[in-house]
Amino acid sequence: MKLKSGFLGLLYSRGYFNQCTDLAELDQLMSKECVIAYIGFDCTARSLHIGSLMQIMILRYLQKCGHKPIVLLGNGTTKIGDPSGKDKSRTLLSSSDIQENTLGIRKVLEKFIVCGDGVSDALLVYNAEWLDKLNYIDFLRNIGRHFSVNNMLTFDSVKLRLEREQNLSFLEFNYMLLQAYDFIELNQRYNCLLQIGGSDQWGNIVNGVELGRKLKLPQLFGLTTHLLLTSTGEKMGKTANGAVWLDGEMYSPADYWQYFRNVKDEDVGRFLRLFTELPLTEIEKLENLKGYEINEAKKILATEATRICHGEKIAQDIAYDALKVFECNDHSGLPVFYVCKSEIELGLSVVKLLQVSGMEKSNSSAKRLINDKGCKINDIIILDVNYKLSLQDFCGMSYIKLSCGKKRHLKVVLESNL
C-alpha cells in the first residue's frame, strides 16, 4: 500500500495497522500538517504491561514523525470499567486506588515519550477533569440522544455478553458514550482529530467519530492496531509467573530482557518490527537467520526492547550479564544433572526436577521453596508451582542454571541421547 504520510506508512510497514475510518483522507491530512492524535489508557493497575506496548510505541512514532500525541489517562472512565473483551464486570476501584494507579501509569509512560509544550511533545490529560463535572440530564439531552440503543446492542462488547446470558450492567453500558464524549472534549480543547486504539476498541472509536459528525465538528478519524498475539494465538502480556509489567519495580528489567530473549523463533521478526526502532533492512537480515543463529536476533530484540523501556545502560548491563551466564562458562564449577531432551519436550515440572535432582527431598518441600520465591531458573524467580520446563527455557543453550535460595545451584544439562 502506497501512503503519502510517513507516519501511516511506518504503521503499515511495521505491522501495526489494522483499519481506519477514512484512510485516504487521513493520509492526505497527515502528509501535509501536524495532526494531534490521542490514545487512552484506563487506570486499572499501578502499571501498564506489554499488552499496551504497541500503543506506546505508536506514541513514540507520532513524535518522531512530527505529530503531537495526547495521552488520555482515564481516571474518570476507570470508575465505570470498559466492558470490551471482558466476560464479566470489572471490580470497581476506590478513588484512592485509581489515583495511585494514575500516578504509576504516568511514571511508566514518561519513560517512553517526551512530555512538554513543544510542537510534538506529548500532552498528559485526565478525563476526570470533564467527566466528574458532567450534568447527567444535560449529558443525556445533548449527547445521549445521538446514540441508538439498537446499534449499541450490535457491538461485540455488548452482544457477546448478552448471547452468553452474562450480566452487563447499565454502568458498563454507558462506557461507550463516555469514550465517545472524550473524543469530543479533546477535539474542542486541543483540536485532536485522531483516536488510536487496539482492534477491540473499534466500536468505541467509531462511536466517537460518528458523534463528532452528528455534532457538526471537523472530520474526526479513528485508527486501530492489530490485537497483540503470539504465533501460538495467545494474548501477549502474561506469563506463567504473571503479567510482564513495564514498571521495573513490578517486573525486573532482567526478567523483561529474558522475556523477549525467550520468544519463539516465529515471533522474532514481527516483534523486532513492533517493539524496536531498528531499520527494516536490518530486521529483514535478522529474521532470516536460521538454526542457532536466530538466538543472536533474539538477544538484539531483548536488548533493544529493554533499552526503550528501561534505558541504555540497564539494557547493556543485562545483555553483558547474560553473555557471561550463557557464553562465558561461568558455571563450569557447578554440580551437573542431566535431563533427557524428550522429557523437556513433554514438559518437565520444576517440582519434579527439584526432587529427582536431589535439590529438594520431596514434592512438598519443592512446592514450599517455590511459594517462598526461593527457586530460580537462570536467575529468574519461578512463582508457579505448576510451571513446566520447555526448550524455550534453555534459550538455545545446552543447559540452564537451577537455583535454590542464594547458595545452592545446579547446572541442568540437556542430553538428547540418554
Curated annotation (Swiss-Prot):
Domain S4 RNA-binding: 348-413
Motif ('KMSKS' region): 235-239
Tagged with keyword Cell membrane: no
Keywords of this entry: Aminoacyl-tRNA synthetase, ATP-binding, Cytoplasm, Ligase, Nucleotide-binding, Protein biosynthesis, RNA-binding
GO molecular function: ATP binding; RNA binding; tyrosine-tRNA ligase activity
Motif ('HIGH' region): 43-52
Cellular localisation: Cytoplasm
Keyword Heme: no
GO biological process: tyrosyl-tRNA aminoacylation
Residues of the signal peptide: none
InterPro entries per the UniProt record, alphabetical: aa-tRNA-synth_Ic (IPR002305), Rossmann-like_a/b/a_fold (IPR014729), S4_RNA-bd_sf (IPR036986), Tyr-tRNA-ligase (IPR002307), Tyr-tRNA-ligase_bac-type (IPR024088), Tyr-tRNA-ligase_bac_1 (IPR024107)
GO cellular component: cytosol
Catalytic function, reaction form: tRNA(Tyr) + L-tyrosine + ATP = L-tyrosyl-tRNA(Tyr) + AMP + diphosphate + H(+)
Xref: HAMAP family: Tyr_tRNA_synth_type1
Family: Belongs to the class-I aminoacyl-tRNA synthetase family. TyrS type 1 subfamily.
Function: Catalyzes the attachment of tyrosine to tRNA(Tyr) in a two-step reaction: tyrosine is first activated by ATP to form Tyr-AMP and then transferred to the acceptor end of tRNA(Tyr).
Name the record gives this protein: Tyrosine--tRNA ligase
